[in-house]
Amino acid sequence: MQTSPLLESLMEALRCLPGVGPKSAQRMAFQLLQRDRSGGMRLAQALTRAMSEIGHCADCRTFTEQEHCTICLNPRRQQNGQICVVESPADIHAIEQTGQFGGRYFVLMGHLSPMDGIGPGDIGLDLLEKRLSTEAISEVILATNPTVEGDATANYIGQMCGQYGILASRIAHGVPVGGELEMVDGTTLSHSLAGRNPIKY
């Protein structure tokens, strides 16, 4: 079936979004054109501005329109002494929603993966080391993903912290709240057993 070249271009562009295949892109394109052209225009303007104006924080590397993000500029967080290392800006959002962390962050934008040719310099570990050597940091909390690559990255950073006498800790991994043991995979259950906590009375 012949369709408009512009429509084809729109559907192809929408496929760059994660989880969007040809059918989903087609539905989105027709929805915008048939029922929500004003929404489509707002989306286009927001995308154009975001792509051209959002960069990376000079300190933690998260997304921001300024040279430094609001978290890094917060005096209370600067005095906290803790840095939480995460793989992506989305991880910061998830941790901030808990309200349990009051320090600053460092975003790797990935993890170590020798098989893919991703080394320490590719995920900004030279910048992290500079912070470790120049700032008053009391603890580095390693919140990389519980994968082989995430664990390897955490171990590498942990050794780096040791060179500067800085405490490094790894976030706990285990059985999710409300989960049933029979539904938990073996690796997660192993982590839960190894990282068990004493009951305090």
Swiss-Prot record:
One Pfam family this chain carries?
A: RecR_C
What domain of life is recorded for the organism? Bacteria
Q: List the cysteine pairs that form cystine.
A: none
Instruction: Kindly list the biological process annotations in GO that this record carries.
Output: double-strand break repair; recombinational repair
Under the heading SUPFAM superfamilies, the entry gives: Recombination protein RecR
Sequence ranges assigned to domain Toprim in this UniProt record: 81-176
Q: Zinc fingers (C4-type) at which residues?
A: 57-72
Molecular functions per Gene Ontology: DNA binding; zinc ion binding
Annotated keywords: DNA damage, DNA recombination, DNA repair, Metal-binding, Zinc, Zinc-finger
| InterPro entries, per the entry | DNA_Rcmb_RecR (IPR000093), Rcmb_RecR (IPR023627), Rcmb_RecR_Znf (IPR015967), TOPRIM_dom (IPR006171), TOPRIM_RecR (IPR034137)
What does the protein in this record do? Answer: May play a role in DNA repair. It seems to be involved in an RecBC-independent recombinational process of DNA repair. It may act with RecF and RecO.
Protein family: Belongs to the RecR family.
Protein known as: Recombination protein RecR
Q: What is the lineage of its organism?
A: Bacteria, Pseudomonadati, Pseudomonadota, Gammaproteobacteria, Enterobacterales
